[in-house]
């Protein structure tokens, strides 16, 4: 009986962590007690201040030393170390006999009197020495299994910690990205605000200048009328001779007096400011960031016309006027050079600084042949291997598209309405476009219908946004000239981004100065051969410079 009591007491003063008698016990708010060393080590490992048994949180300042449990544990140690008590442990608490048998049904050690009692009668029993090895092996296997489970639990714990760290890093990255995007948005807004204020200041300057001039004109007009009034008053108050002297001239002057009204400025004609589309601006900025991920290291190929100069690092080209001109160099389109490397696949992006230049052409070209053969303006077409945009006369931005077939010039805009026959078998209905035979158009009273290629009946409508013009001389017109597509810029680009997607067959141009807005995009490009970056400084001596990502 005494042994059973000791066992119960021992359970009460045993640390749940180390399973030994409590040493310097500390009690938590929940009532559980642990060794001071055990609870401290547990906190360092788990990094959580919670009870290992019930998981109730606690504060370290609330840990209380439990002297009562410490005294009980100390007394129990003394009893367990006593030789007499050690002998009692091996004896039956009920009968006082040695515990020599093991009951298979109850799984307990019993004495020979217990075996004969009603409680264990008919149960299968064995000597403790016989079953000890068997259960030792079972417990050893169980120990190995639990150690493996401990390792698995530690791995799961490590996985949770790793996932926690991963999420923390990901969220921190998202925070950084969000801050960067909003900073970029604020920079965009600051830039837009500055541009709008500059426009308003310029408008104010021009408007006030004109109003001041108008005020001066009105002052002069009032002064001239006052002079005339003073002359009339003097004549009326003077003698007859003074009244009649030159009176016809005075009357004529009076008849010629007409009040000039001041120049007026209608408020409704003023440009109304509209807040920028923030969502659209962010989308544009996102698209620019996406293509900038494909930044290519482009350099200029030294094989170039003598009228151009390339820097030593092969990243800058400029026009240099020559004293002795080659006859073919009189045409001002051929100062272009190619970039390296050649492109046969993938996505590639580069940026070109064109600050303060009054003329330039850039984009993509299919072959080096154009450099040696000095091509004409007609070559600036996708069908000839050029996908380019350019600037001329400081403010005319254009994209170069394929020339429209001549039959497309027969369009109804010229008031000529009739049916015509062309090349014996092509009859077509024509609508307005361009001069020459093209003048058979509605705007010139020519409208007609007919058959084309024996089976195709077509109506041709106007393409008012396009013109066949020479890049340097708008007065010239040629059927083979490229179709010039005007490009309208709210902010003139100082830096132009070029994005080539070889597999998608597209070439896109971005106004980096205007936060990455798309300038123009060529689609369905036929890249049959390797393509090269293309640059032409034209006759402007300011350089074109390839930019680096860091700039």
From Swiss-Prot:
Q: What is this protein called?
A: Tripartite motif-containing protein 5
Q: What is the lineage of its organism?
A: Eukaryota, Metazoa, Chordata, Craniata, Vertebrata
Summarize the protein's role.
Answer: Capsid-specific restriction factor that prevents infection from non-host-adapted retroviruses. Blocks viral replication early in the life cycle, after viral entry but before reverse transcription. In addition to acting as a capsid-specific restriction factor, also acts as a pattern recognition receptor that activates innate immune signaling in response to the retroviral capsid lattice.
From the UniProt record, list the reaction(s) this protein catalyses.
S-ubiquitinyl-[E2 ubiquitin-conjugating enzyme]-L-cysteine + [acceptor protein]-L-lysine = [E2 ubiquitin-conjugating enzyme]-L-cysteine + N(6)-ubiquitinyl-[acceptor protein]-L-lysine
- Give me the ranges of the annotated region Required for interaction with GABARAP and for autophagy: 182-195
The record, for SMART domains, names: BBOX (SM00336), RING (SM00184), SPRY (SM00449)
**In terms of domain of life, where is this protein from?**
Eukaryota
PTM per Swiss-Prot/TrEMBL: Degraded in a proteasome-independent fashion in the absence of viral infection but in a proteasome-dependent fashion following exposure to restriction sensitive virus.
Subunit structure, interactors included: Can form homodimers and homotrimers. In addition to lower-order dimerization, also exhibits a higher-order multimerization and both low- and high-order multimerizations are essential for its restriction activity. Interacts with BTBD1 and BTBD2. Interacts with PSMC4, PSMC5, PSMD7 and HSPA8/HSC70. Interacts (via B30.2/SPRY domain) with HSPA1A/B. Interacts with PSMC2, MAP3K7/TAK1, TAB2 and TAB3. Interacts with SQSTM1. Interacts with TRIM6 and TRIM34. Interacts with ULK1 (phosphorylated form), GABARAP, GABARAPL1, GABARAPL2, MAP1LC3A, MAP1LC3C and BECN1.
Please tell me one Gene Ontology term that the record gives under cellular component.
P-body
Pathway-wise, it operates in: Protein modification; protein ubiquitination
| InterPro entries given in the database record | B30.2/SPRY (IPR001870), B30.2/SPRY_sf (IPR043136), ConA-like_dom_sf (IPR013320), SPRY_dom (IPR003877), TRIM/RBCC (IPR050143), Znf-RING_euk (IPR027370), Znf_B-box (IPR000315), Znf_RING (IPR001841)
User: Per UniProt, which keywords does this protein have?
Assistant: Acetylation, Antiviral defense, Autophagy, Coiled coil, Cytoplasm, Immunity, Innate immunity, Metal-binding, Nucleus, Phosphoprotein, Transferase, Ubl conjugation, Ubl conjugation pathway, Zinc, Zinc-finger
* Matches recorded under CDD domains: Bbox2_TRIM5-like (cd19761), RING-HC_TRIM5-like_C-IV (cd16591)
Which Pfam family, just one, is annotated for this protein? Answer: zf-B_box
| GO-annotated molecular function | pattern recognition receptor activity; ubiquitin-protein transferase activity; zinc ion binding
Provide the B30.2/SPRY domain boundaries.
276-551
Q: Does the keyword Metal-binding apply?
A: yes
Q: What is its EC number?
A: 2.3.2.27
Which one GO biological process term can you cite for this protein? innate immune response
List residues, modification Phosphoserine.
82
> Does the keyword section mention Transferase?
yes
